Amino acid sequence: YLYNMFLKAKIKIFSVLLIIFQSSFSFSDTFIYSGGCFWCTEADTEKLPGVISVISGFTSGTTPNPKYYPGEWGDHREAALVNFNPNLISLDTLIKHVFKTIDYEDNEGQFCDRGRSYSPAIYYKNDYEKNLISSLAPKSSVVPIEPETKFFPVREEHQDYYLKNPFQYNFYRYRCGRDFRLDELNK
């Protein structure tokens, strides 16, 4: 009886130490891209195994503190900040995913949304990432590959919009023709 209690206590201690050890060595990385409407980029990317979270927001502009009101995001692009575990999903897998979920042949906007704020771009932190993105881009890609700049999260009501407002989100996505065009590109 005492031996079994001792063994159970040892197993519990080992389990706690294992959890502490794993959490102290787990890490994440980030990746930013623009692919049109951030509701869609967030929805398309958040479901990938190894993606911890996706935050909708703005990047690559000069307007201080952009907001989601017409004209108040200035020259920023809508973007997704992807927080991921590189032990579970590689950066090259994420980059390939981006090219499958954007219209890489259109740099004037995406689908029904037009203008710079909806235009695609993929951002890099260093030369390795820049070269990796370039090597994975489809031959017909016109997507700019740019240095990462400050990211500004959008208001909470726009985070996880596809989950909070599924009817409106799905209507918008269908009306915009996003999936129809992606099916054409990814034949």
Residue ranges, per PLM feature:
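N-terminal signal peptide c-region/cleavage motif recognized by signal peptidases
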Residues: 21-23
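Flexible coil/turn and secondary-structure edge motifs
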Residues: 25-187
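Bacterial N-terminal signal peptides that target proteins for export
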Residues: 4-14
